[in-house]
Design a protein with these regions (language model features):
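Terminal amphipathic alpha-helical/low-complexity segments used for targeting or macromolecular assembly
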Residues: 1-55, 169-183
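Residues at secondary-structure transition points
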Residues: 14, 47, 67, 87, ...
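Glycine-rich, flexible loop/turn motifs
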Residues: 26, 110, 118, 154, ...
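Short linear capping/connector segments at secondary-structure termini
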Residues: 41, 60-61, 110
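Left-handed beta-helix
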Residues: 54, 59-60, 65-66, 73-74, ...
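Conserved catalytic-core motifs of eukaryotic protein kinase domains, centered on the activation segment
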Residues: 108-110, 114-116, 140, 174-175
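Short, glycine/charged-enriched secondary-structure capping and boundary segments
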Residues: 112-113, 119, 162-163, 177-180
Length: 183
């Protein structure tokens, strides 16, 4: 079972608050920069503390909380309008695709103590594709080369090579794994 981390947001240190303010400023600058400009590339690396792989890009606008908890592999594309709530960490492996307006949410509020956030990692595995407008919730892994259909709400793990759709997302078919070559 995945360990849950709990954070009381009323007890943030001054350093944590300063880091949050820095991230907000960097993301604002990123969202105002011309895509693919030198500033845009520099800010992208700075936002993710260099944990973004070769030939990867995150398109603006981006909304992110604790982006230093996000790791992005090589050859990843994250399209416009992505929300990354990453207190529980978000990992996006090589060759993954995140379509427009996807929400990657690794934290939630405790239903009885709302000043406490509960955190579990989100993992998007190699070659996975998360369709437009989908939400991936805390503790979920989207498997290798899996597809999440547009508008889905993913509350449980999606197995490797599965196609899952709906709210909540359910597996509707399987991809032929022999059609995928690891690069």
């Amino acid at each position: 079972m995945m360990k849950e981390v709990r954070i009381d947001v009323t007890k943030q240190t001054s350093e944590e608050l300063e880091l949050a303010a820095l991230h907000a400023r960097l993301i604002h600058q990123f969202n105002q920069s011309a895509p693919f400009s030198d500033d845009w590339w520099r800010l992208q690396k700075e936002i993710f503390k260099g944990k973004i792989g070769e030939n990867s890009r995150v398109m603006s606008p981006l909304t992110a909380v604790r982006p230093h908890e996000v790791t992005i592999g090589n050859n990843v594309v994250v399209m416009n309008g992505c929300l990354m709530m990453s207190a529980g960490t978000i990992t996006i492996d090589d060759d993954a695709r995140i379509a427009a307006n996807v929400q990657l949410i690794s934290n939630n509020h405790d239903p009885y103590h709302r000043e406490v956030i509960t955190c579990k990692p989100v993992h998007i595995c190699k070659g996975a594709w998360v369709g437009a407008g989908s939400s991936v919730l805390p503790g979920v892994t989207v498997g290798r080369y899996a597809i999440v259909g547009a508008g889905s709400v993913v509350t449980k793990d999606v197995p490797d090579y599965a196609v899952a759709v709906g709210n909540p997302a359910k597996v509707i078919k399987w991809l032929d794994k022999t059609k995928f070559e690891d690069k």
